[in-house]
Amino acid sequence: MTTNNFSHTSVLLDEAVNGLNIKPSGIYIDGTFGRGGHSRLILSQLGEQGRLIAIDRDPQAIAVANEIDDPRFSIIHGPFSNIEHYINELGLSGKVDGVLLDLGVSSPQLDDPERGFSFMRDGPLDMRMDPTTGQSAAQWLMNAEEDDITWVLKTFGEERFAKRIARAIVARNKTEEPLTRTKQLADLISEASPVKERHKHPATRSFQAIRIYINSELDEIEKALKGAVSILAPAGRLSVISFHSLEDRLVKRFIRDESKGPVVPAGIPLTEEQIKALGSARLSSIHKMKPTGVEVEENPRARSSVLRVAQRIEE
């Protein structure tokens, strides 16, 4: 597997790793290896007894990870939603000192036209995080009903012209050759959008929505968060970077819910043992951070990012 030459600047790099409160002999998980920015910084802070396990479902990321020659480091090819399974298989559940998740699409994925994520560069209409599995965006759009496309654009892109765009996509696929290129789709969306926002391409929300749907991103994140909390040691840290409001709302809600104890409706007689069986709070929120103005100026893609850090409650 060859790698591309597109560079990637990790957003909130120091802040996300600092949020893990690295112990030199600790065990850490980088659930989204990408191009290894966070992993390399974590390794630089680990001692000889420390261990870092990275996960990524992108074959290009795996190729980059395989170039790291360090006995403390290992890479797993697969979705981060399976984090609990991977760590259970390694016999490390409850022993992990920190999990880092950097959500969304990496710069190399966006910048490589062959991956089909960007409306700014023409390429195959793919959008899969792992191009070796699942259906591409083009395949889905070719067979999807207008109502299904409308729902995806509204739900995952908050696109106000979702119905117009969906109608245009279905009409195009029925009357002409199906959409197979990113530029074809971007141009179609532009034509179908009656109002253009300043400083934002008309296809921005639709491309985001289709990408999230094709990769089941929000479901993957929810499973990854649940798995991450389950494998953390007492006082272990969870450090999560999100890049748009849908991701951040999900992360915020998850940390909030995991910070509460069981809610017992008034008037229901339960013994202390029964209340304990309902479970207890597992996380405490540490802090929320956004990038500095300097970082946003140097890396505009950092603009909408949010870092949230939480800690596993010691039982």
Swiss-Prot record:
It catalyses: cytidine(1402) in 16S rRNA + S-adenosyl-L-methionine = N(4)-methylcytidine(1402) in 16S rRNA + S-adenosyl-L-homocysteine + H(+). One of its GO terms (molecular function) is rRNA (cytosine-N4-)-methyltransferase activity. It is an enzyme of class 2 (transferase). It is found in: Cytoplasm. S-adenosyl-L-methionine binds at residues 36-38, 56, 80, 102, 109. It comes from the Bacteria. Its EC number is 2.1.1.199. GO terms for biological process: rRNA base methylation. Its main location: cytoplasm. Keywords: Cytoplasm, Methyltransferase, rRNA processing, S-adenosyl-L-methionine, Transferase. The keyword rRNA processing applies. SUPFAM superfamilies: Putative methyltransferase TM0872, insert domain, S-adenosyl-L-methionine-dependent methyltransferases. GO terms for cellular component: cytoplasm. NCBIfam families: 16S rRNA (cytosine(1402)-N(4))-methyltransferase RsmH. Belongs to the methyltransferase superfamily. RsmH family. Specifically methylates the N4 position of cytidine in position 1402 (C1402) of 16S rRNA. PANTHER family: 12S RRNA N4-METHYLCYTIDINE METHYLTRANSFERASE (PTHR11265:SF0), S-ADENOSYL-METHYLTRANSFERASE MRAW (PTHR11265). This is Ribosomal RNA small subunit methyltransferase H.
